[in-house]
Amino acid sequence: MGRKVLVVDCDPQANATAGLGIDPSASGKNMYDVFMSGIDGFPRVALGDIIRKTASGIDLAPSHLDLVGAEPYLYHAAFPTGVLNEALADVKNQYSYIFIDTPPSLGQFVINGLYAADHVIVTLDSGSFALNGVTTLSTIFADIKNDLGKEIRPDMAIVSRWGEGSRQGCETEERTDLFTRIFHIFHKPPEPSVKEIQDAKEQKKEQERLLATLAEIRKRFPSVYTVPYSPAVYEAQKRGMPISHFAPDSSAGVVYKAIADEVMKWT
Protein backbone atom coordinates (compact mmCIF):
# COMPACT_ATOMS: atom_id res chain seq x y z
CA MET A 1 0.00 0.00 0.00
CA GLY A 2 3.03 2.24 -0.32
CA ARG A 3 3.68 2.58 3.41
CA LYS A 4 7.13 2.19 4.96
CA VAL A 5 7.11 -0.86 7.23
CA LEU A 6 9.60 -2.37 9.66
CA VAL A 7 9.31 -5.88 11.11
CA VAL A 8 11.21 -6.44 14.36
CA ASP A 9 11.72 -10.16 14.93
CA CYS A 10 12.00 -10.84 18.66
CA ASP A 11 11.44 -14.59 18.35
CA PRO A 12 14.58 -16.78 18.56
CA GLN A 13 12.90 -19.19 16.14
CA ALA A 14 13.32 -16.41 13.55
CA ASN A 15 10.32 -17.43 11.44
CA ALA A 16 9.54 -13.83 10.51
CA THR A 17 13.15 -13.40 9.42
CA ALA A 18 13.09 -16.49 7.22
CA GLY A 19 9.61 -15.60 5.96
CA LEU A 20 10.98 -12.31 4.62
CA GLY A 21 13.77 -14.04 2.75
CA ILE A 22 16.68 -13.52 5.17
CA ASP A 23 18.68 -16.54 6.32
CA PRO A 24 18.52 -16.52 10.15
CA SER A 25 21.89 -18.28 10.34
CA ALA A 26 23.66 -15.65 8.25
CA SER A 27 26.41 -13.65 9.91
CA GLY A 28 25.79 -10.08 10.92
CA LYS A 29 24.25 -8.12 13.76
CA ASN A 30 20.75 -9.07 14.85
CA MET A 31 18.28 -8.57 17.70
CA TYR A 32 20.57 -10.46 20.07
CA ASP A 33 23.08 -7.63 19.78
CA VAL A 34 20.38 -4.99 20.31
CA PHE A 35 19.04 -6.61 23.47
CA MET A 36 22.55 -7.18 24.84
CA SER A 37 23.43 -3.50 24.34
CA GLY A 38 21.79 -2.68 27.65
CA ILE A 39 24.04 -5.08 29.53
CA ASP A 40 27.32 -3.93 31.06
CA GLY A 41 30.33 -5.17 29.15
CA PHE A 42 28.60 -5.61 25.80
CA PRO A 43 29.06 -3.22 22.84
CA ARG A 44 26.37 -0.71 21.98
CA VAL A 45 24.39 -1.77 18.90
CA ALA A 46 21.50 0.43 17.84
CA LEU A 47 18.41 -0.99 16.17
CA GLY A 48 19.17 1.03 13.06
CA ASP A 49 22.54 -0.74 12.78
CA ILE A 50 20.96 -4.15 12.12
CA ILE A 51 18.04 -3.26 9.82
CA ARG A 52 18.12 -4.98 6.45
CA LYS A 53 16.16 -4.43 3.27
CA THR A 54 14.12 -7.37 1.98
CA ALA A 55 12.94 -8.24 -1.52
CA SER A 56 9.37 -7.26 -0.70
CA GLY A 57 10.39 -3.73 0.32
CA ILE A 58 9.77 -4.38 4.00
CA ASP A 59 12.63 -3.50 6.34
CA LEU A 60 13.63 -6.16 8.85
CA ALA A 61 15.42 -6.24 12.19
CA PRO A 62 16.39 -9.94 12.01
CA SER A 63 16.43 -12.51 14.76
CA HIS A 64 18.82 -15.39 15.42
CA LEU A 65 18.85 -18.48 17.58
CA ASP A 66 21.46 -16.70 19.73
CA LEU A 67 18.62 -14.54 21.03
CA VAL A 68 17.77 -17.37 23.43
CA GLY A 69 20.96 -16.55 25.32
CA ALA A 70 20.03 -12.90 25.79
CA GLU A 71 16.96 -13.45 27.94
CA PRO A 72 18.74 -14.38 31.22
CA TYR A 73 20.83 -11.20 30.94
CA LEU A 74 17.76 -9.01 30.55
CA TYR A 75 16.73 -9.65 34.14
CA HIS A 76 19.89 -7.77 35.18
CA ALA A 77 19.20 -4.71 33.02
CA ALA A 78 18.27 -1.45 34.72
CA PHE A 79 14.76 -1.61 33.22
CA PRO A 80 14.32 -5.09 31.66
CA THR A 81 10.84 -4.42 30.31
CA GLY A 82 11.83 -1.28 28.42
CA VAL A 83 14.90 -2.44 26.47
CA LEU A 84 13.02 -2.82 23.18
CA ASN A 85 11.00 0.35 23.68
CA GLU A 86 14.21 2.33 24.15
CA ALA A 87 15.78 0.75 21.07
CA LEU A 88 12.75 1.60 18.93
CA ALA A 89 12.93 5.27 19.88
CA ASP A 90 15.78 5.83 17.41
CA VAL A 91 13.86 4.56 14.36
CA LYS A 92 10.12 4.79 15.01
CA ASN A 93 9.73 8.15 13.27
CA GLN A 94 11.17 6.65 10.07
CA TYR A 95 8.28 4.21 9.53
CA SER A 96 4.53 4.28 9.01
CA TYR A 97 4.19 0.96 10.83
CA ILE A 98 6.46 -1.18 12.97
CA PHE A 99 5.42 -4.78 13.64
CA ILE A 100 6.98 -6.61 16.57
CA ASP A 101 6.93 -10.39 16.31
CA THR A 102 7.21 -12.09 19.69
CA PRO A 103 7.74 -15.74 20.65
CA PRO A 104 4.80 -18.05 21.43
CA SER A 105 6.28 -18.73 24.86
CA LEU A 106 6.24 -16.46 27.90
CA GLY A 107 9.28 -14.40 28.82
CA GLN A 108 11.04 -11.07 28.56
CA PHE A 109 10.71 -10.81 24.77
CA VAL A 110 6.92 -11.00 24.94
CA ILE A 111 6.77 -8.48 27.78
CA ASN A 112 9.18 -6.14 25.97
CA GLY A 113 7.03 -6.33 22.86
CA LEU A 114 3.79 -5.65 24.72
CA TYR A 115 5.30 -2.74 26.63
CA ALA A 116 6.62 -1.13 23.44
CA ALA A 117 3.46 -1.62 21.36
CA ASP A 118 0.68 0.89 20.74
CA HIS A 119 -1.65 -1.88 19.56
CA VAL A 120 -1.77 -5.63 20.12
CA ILE A 121 -2.76 -8.33 17.64
CA VAL A 122 -3.07 -11.82 19.10
CA THR A 123 -2.48 -14.67 16.66
CA LEU A 124 -4.02 -18.07 17.38
CA ASP A 125 -4.39 -21.30 15.49
CA SER A 126 -7.60 -23.27 15.39
CA GLY A 127 -6.34 -26.04 17.67
CA SER A 128 -7.91 -27.22 20.90
CA PHE A 129 -5.62 -25.12 23.10
CA ALA A 130 -6.28 -21.73 21.51
CA LEU A 131 -8.45 -20.55 24.41
CA ASN A 132 -5.80 -21.62 26.92
CA GLY A 133 -3.38 -19.25 25.22
CA VAL A 134 -5.89 -16.40 25.44
CA THR A 135 -6.35 -17.00 29.17
CA THR A 136 -2.58 -16.98 29.73
CA LEU A 137 -2.22 -13.73 27.80
CA SER A 138 -4.95 -12.13 29.89
CA THR A 139 -2.89 -12.94 32.98
CA ILE A 140 0.19 -11.30 31.43
CA PHE A 141 -1.83 -8.19 30.55
CA ALA A 142 -3.02 -7.93 34.14
CA ASP A 143 0.53 -8.35 35.49
CA ILE A 144 1.86 -5.61 33.22
CA LYS A 145 -0.88 -3.27 34.40
CA ASN A 146 -0.16 -4.02 38.05
CA ASP A 147 3.62 -3.86 37.79
CA LEU A 148 4.15 -1.17 35.14
CA GLY A 149 0.91 0.77 35.09
CA LYS A 150 0.31 0.17 31.39
CA GLU A 151 -3.10 -1.19 30.47
CA ILE A 152 -3.05 -3.51 27.48
CA ARG A 153 -6.20 -4.21 25.56
CA PRO A 154 -5.71 -6.35 22.46
CA ASP A 155 -7.25 -4.83 19.36
CA MET A 156 -7.58 -7.92 17.21
CA ALA A 157 -7.33 -11.71 17.13
CA ILE A 158 -6.31 -13.62 14.03
CA VAL A 159 -7.15 -17.32 13.92
CA SER A 160 -4.89 -18.87 11.30
CA ARG A 161 -5.11 -22.13 9.34
CA TRP A 162 -8.88 -22.07 9.77
CA GLY A 163 -10.36 -25.32 8.45
CA GLU A 164 -7.01 -27.12 8.12
CA GLY A 165 -7.59 -30.83 7.78
CA SER A 166 -11.20 -30.45 6.72
CA ARG A 167 -13.07 -29.17 3.70
CA GLN A 168 -14.09 -26.02 5.57
CA GLY A 169 -12.08 -23.08 4.29
CA CYS A 170 -9.70 -25.31 2.34
CA GLU A 171 -8.76 -24.58 -1.26
CA THR A 172 -9.14 -27.80 -3.25
CA GLU A 173 -9.56 -28.68 -6.89
CA GLU A 174 -12.69 -30.62 -5.95
CA ARG A 175 -14.59 -27.39 -5.30
CA THR A 176 -13.89 -26.01 -8.76
CA ASP A 177 -13.93 -29.25 -10.80
CA LEU A 178 -16.85 -28.66 -13.18
CA PHE A 179 -16.56 -32.12 -14.71
CA THR A 180 -17.05 -33.77 -11.31
CA ARG A 181 -20.18 -31.71 -10.64
CA ILE A 182 -21.70 -32.62 -14.02
CA PHE A 183 -20.80 -36.27 -13.57
CA HIS A 184 -22.65 -36.40 -10.23
CA ILE A 185 -25.78 -34.96 -11.87
CA PHE A 186 -26.14 -38.02 -14.14
CA HIS A 187 -24.55 -40.68 -11.97
CA LYS A 188 -25.67 -41.45 -8.46
CA PRO A 189 -22.65 -41.54 -6.17
CA PRO A 190 -21.96 -44.86 -4.42
CA GLU A 191 -23.25 -45.46 -0.92
CA PRO A 192 -20.73 -44.25 1.68
CA SER A 193 -18.68 -46.85 3.51
CA VAL A 194 -18.72 -47.28 7.28
CA LYS A 195 -15.40 -45.45 7.47
CA GLU A 196 -16.68 -42.56 5.33
CA ILE A 197 -19.75 -42.23 7.57
CA GLN A 198 -17.55 -42.21 10.67
CA ASP A 199 -15.21 -39.66 9.10
CA ALA A 200 -18.17 -37.42 8.26
CA LYS A 201 -19.39 -37.58 11.87
CA GLU A 202 -15.93 -36.71 13.18
CA GLN A 203 -15.64 -33.84 10.73
CA LYS A 204 -19.01 -32.47 11.82
CA LYS A 205 -17.95 -32.72 15.46
CA GLU A 206 -14.69 -30.88 14.67
CA GLN A 207 -16.56 -28.12 12.85
CA GLU A 208 -18.86 -27.70 15.85
CA ARG A 209 -15.80 -27.43 18.10
CA LEU A 210 -14.24 -24.84 15.83
CA LEU A 211 -17.40 -22.74 15.78
CA ALA A 212 -17.71 -22.95 19.58
CA THR A 213 -14.07 -21.88 19.98
CA LEU A 214 -14.58 -19.00 17.57
CA ALA A 215 -17.66 -17.85 19.48
CA GLU A 216 -15.61 -17.70 22.70
CA ILE A 217 -12.80 -15.79 20.99
CA ARG A 218 -15.29 -13.26 19.60
CA LYS A 219 -16.43 -12.54 23.17
CA ARG A 220 -12.89 -11.55 24.18
CA PHE A 221 -11.69 -9.45 21.24
CA PRO A 222 -13.25 -6.42 19.54
CA SER A 223 -12.19 -7.69 16.11
CA VAL A 224 -11.62 -11.29 14.99
CA TYR A 225 -10.51 -12.65 11.63
CA THR A 226 -10.30 -16.27 10.51
CA VAL A 227 -7.65 -16.93 7.87
CA PRO A 228 -8.53 -20.08 5.90
CA TYR A 229 -5.94 -22.77 5.44
CA SER A 230 -4.19 -22.16 2.13
CA PRO A 231 -1.12 -23.85 0.60
CA ALA A 232 -0.24 -20.44 -0.84
CA VAL A 233 0.85 -19.27 2.64
CA TYR A 234 3.50 -21.98 2.88
CA GLU A 235 4.67 -21.37 -0.68
CA ALA A 236 5.03 -17.67 0.09
CA GLN A 237 7.06 -18.44 3.22
CA LYS A 238 9.40 -20.73 1.29
CA ARG A 239 10.03 -17.96 -1.21
CA GLY A 240 10.61 -15.37 1.50
CA MET A 241 7.72 -13.17 0.37
CA PRO A 242 4.57 -11.90 2.12
CA ILE A 243 1.30 -13.39 0.91
CA SER A 244 0.38 -9.88 -0.31
CA HIS A 245 3.20 -10.11 -2.86
CA PHE A 246 3.11 -13.83 -3.71
CA ALA A 247 -0.60 -14.67 -3.87
CA PRO A 248 -2.78 -11.67 -2.96
CA ASP A 249 -5.89 -13.22 -4.53
CA SER A 250 -5.65 -16.50 -2.61
CA SER A 251 -8.24 -17.14 0.09
CA ALA A 252 -5.69 -16.25 2.80
CA GLY A 253 -4.38 -13.26 0.85
CA VAL A 254 -7.86 -11.72 0.61
CA VAL A 255 -8.35 -11.95 4.37
CA TYR A 256 -4.92 -10.50 5.14
CA LYS A 257 -5.76 -7.59 2.84
CA ALA A 258 -8.90 -6.96 4.92
CA ILE A 259 -6.78 -7.15 8.08
CA ALA A 260 -4.32 -4.61 6.66
CA ASP A 261 -7.21 -2.28 5.76
CA GLU A 262 -8.43 -2.35 9.36
CA VAL A 263 -4.97 -1.87 10.86
CA MET A 264 -4.47 1.22 8.70
CA LYS A 265 -7.53 2.80 10.32
CA TRP A 266 -5.89 2.65 13.75
CA THR A 267 -3.62 5.63 13.06
What are these regions (language model features)?
Residues 1-267:
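P-loop NTP-binding core
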